[in-house]
């Protein structure tokens, strides 16, 4: 159970997309804290399937797409994202950087001008360039949970700035993670 998760409706696209992919996610204990909706998430293992992500969900999950790309890599079949050209002008070109990283791990990922096509397959290991993008670094750390080999991620110093304690939380979730340098 993940406790006290923000559930602002302008930010919950990630839940809708994961559920459409087959994820078993239930929201419990919904409440308002400081005027914002929060709740607890119960997540159970479930096979994911590739989908065409509805464009109306893009603005509701724009910052979560690197993690969703990892979910797509672990899904059965093809996931198609369109209408997400904004991802090209974030801290990095998240479409290209994620496509390159997934390819390094042996996952078929074809970038398009406004999105990406990912064919699910088990990720392997490799060295990933995060390009200093905290969301890229954290997403590939998550990928290590399913990878067939170790994943080394370069240029991760800003992760602790945006998500203090990420490495400790990830380790507590079963990830074999080491921060070097």
Where do the model's predicted regions map?
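Short, structured segments at the rim of ligand-binding sites
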Residues: 1-181
């Amino acid at each position: 159970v993940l406790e006290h998760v923000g559930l602002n409706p302008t930010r919950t696209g990630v839940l809708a997309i994961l559920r459409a992919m087959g994820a078993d996610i239930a929201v419990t204990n919904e409440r308002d804290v400081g005027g914002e909706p929060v709740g607890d998430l119960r997540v159970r293992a479930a096979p994911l399937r590739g989908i065409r992500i509805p464009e109306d969900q893009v603005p509701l999950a724009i910052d979560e797409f690197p993690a969703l790309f990892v979910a797509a890599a672990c899904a059965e079949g093809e996931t198609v994202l369109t209408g997400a050209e904004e991802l090209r002008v974030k801290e990095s070109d998240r479409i290209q950087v994620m496509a390159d990283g997934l390819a390094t791990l042996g996952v078929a990922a074809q970038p398009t001008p406004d999105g990406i096509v990912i064919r699910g397959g088990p990720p392997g290991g490799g060295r990933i360039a995060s390009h200093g993008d905290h969301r890229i670094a954290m997403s590939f750390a998550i990928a290590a949970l399913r990878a067939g080999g170790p994943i080394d991620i370069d240029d991760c110093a800003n992760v602790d700035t945006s998500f203090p304690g990420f490495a400790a939380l990830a380790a507590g979730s079963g990830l074999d993670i080491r921060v070097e340098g």
